[in-house]
């Protein structure tokens, strides 16, 4: 009889017929679960909060069967995703979190390496620590406007993540929240954020520019450490603290714009391995002298004052249509021995793609300059006398760069 049973099982298997196993139980006061191993679906039914688990030996009841799970169905009416709920469900491909959920627990989806899509419901207010860490299949994430806090390590080492949209209610980005997201190329930090945690974006090598809004008061240590692709950073005017190594090893930085009226007191390692002789530091025009005297900031060779201008758009009848504020970054003028740079002269006052500028110099008293002077250090640079001043004509066009602020 045993031989016949073995034969029949083998026959069913060879015909592609497999026997489904059903596992079930409770996962909350009013929630139950059922796992069908044949269709790889874990179905949660009921309403209310899910139980929290805490790891060995306290695992979710389906943890031993996690290798079967590819799909999870969550009901409208569930209000929380428990701690460690779906940790290490490496076959899970996507998750849709219903609008009834208000909280995603710590480690809830940690290690779900096959997950390529996540939809976060519009009533979620908190994303727990390590909630989506090591979800290495994720390429984009939208955090809805309902969320107020992103936990520590929330998306840590999601190294295929290329873009993140952070909702406009988030007040804090946790430590290492996006650390190691090396493919991240775009992130917009909303005006609601006040704190950027330690290591929040460390080793995000794909980032090329970051704007830290005026709402932020503190940038944590190592927040952008090792972001070697970062070329431009704008620091809002409310930032009072910048932690150690915040921008260390950001070797590609060419522009740092700091709107703080008073230079922050920072450690010498904040900009370690940033080339301060080529990276331009843009500051408020009236604060230039303060930065030139402040520790660390004074190490930047090129400290340039910037101005804000309101640009008004009018129709043909001069009726105002719209206005916005633009920050104009004045380029760094060439240094020419024997001459002192005194300012920029505009060729046109009409702002289109940029204002064309001419560098204006005065000859030093000890230097006798001809009407046309060729810089021996760079023959392409010629100074032409115009009254009591000299104007640089080097075949280049210098333009103020306009950046939208509001």
Give each language-model segment a name.
Residues 18-20:
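Boundary at the C-terminal end of the N-terminal hydrophobic targeting segment
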Residues 41-48, 66-80, 90-103, 113-126, ...:
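Structural signature of tandem-repeat unit edges
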Residues 365-406:
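C-terminal outer-membrane/trafficking sorting elements
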């Amino acid at each position: 009889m045993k031989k016949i049973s073995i034969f029949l099982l083998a026959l069913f298997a060879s015909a592609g017929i497999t026997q489904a196993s059903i596992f079930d139980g409770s996962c909350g006061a009013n929630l139950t679960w059922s796992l069908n191993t044949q269709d790889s679906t874990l179905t949660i039914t009921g309403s209310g909060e899910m139980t929290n688990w805490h790891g060995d030996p306290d695992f979710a009841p389906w943890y031993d069967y996690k290798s079967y799970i590819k799909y999870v169905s969550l009901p409208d009416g569930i209000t929380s995703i428990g701690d460690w709920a779906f940790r290490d469900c490496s076959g899970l491909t996507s998750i849709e979190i219903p609008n009834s959920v208000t909280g995603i627990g710590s480690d809830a989806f940690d290690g779900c390496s096959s997950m390529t899509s996540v939809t976060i419901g519009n009533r979620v207010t908190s994303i727990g620590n390590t909630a989506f860490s090591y979800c290495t299949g994720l390429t984009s994430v939208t955090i809805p406007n309902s969320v107020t806090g992103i936990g520590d390590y929330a998306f840590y080492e999601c190294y295929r993540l290329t873009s993140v949209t952070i909702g406009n209610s988030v007040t804090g980005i946790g430590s290492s929240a996006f650390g190691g997201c090396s493919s991240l190329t775009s992130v917009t930090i909303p005006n609601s954020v006040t704190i950027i945690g330690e290591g929040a974006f460390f080793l995000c090598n794909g980032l090329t520019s970051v704007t830290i809004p005026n709402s932020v008061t503190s940038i944590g240590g190592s927040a952008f450490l090792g972001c070697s692709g970062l070329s431009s950073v704008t620091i809002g005017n409310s930032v009072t603290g910048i932690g150690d190594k915040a921008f260390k090893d950001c070797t590609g930085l060419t522009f740092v714009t700091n709107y703080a009226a008073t230079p922050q007191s920072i450690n010498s390692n904040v900009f370690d391995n940033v080339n301060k002789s080529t990276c331009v530091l843009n500051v408020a025009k009236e604060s230039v002298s303060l930065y030139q005297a402040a520790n660390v900031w004074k190490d930047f060779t090129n400290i340039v004052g910037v101005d804000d201008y309101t640009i008004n758009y009018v129709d043909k009848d001069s009726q105002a249509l719209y206005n916005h504020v633009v920050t104009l970054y004045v380029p760094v003028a060439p240094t020419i021995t024997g001459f002192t740079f005194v300012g920029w002269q505009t060729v046109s006052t009409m702002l289109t793609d940029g204002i064309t500028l001419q560098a204006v110099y005065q000859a030093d008293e000890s230097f006798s300059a001809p009407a046309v002077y060729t810089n021996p250090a760079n023959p392409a640079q010629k100074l032409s006398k115009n009254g009591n001043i000299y104007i640089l004509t080097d075949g280049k066009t210098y333009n103020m760069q306009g950046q939208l602020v509001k």
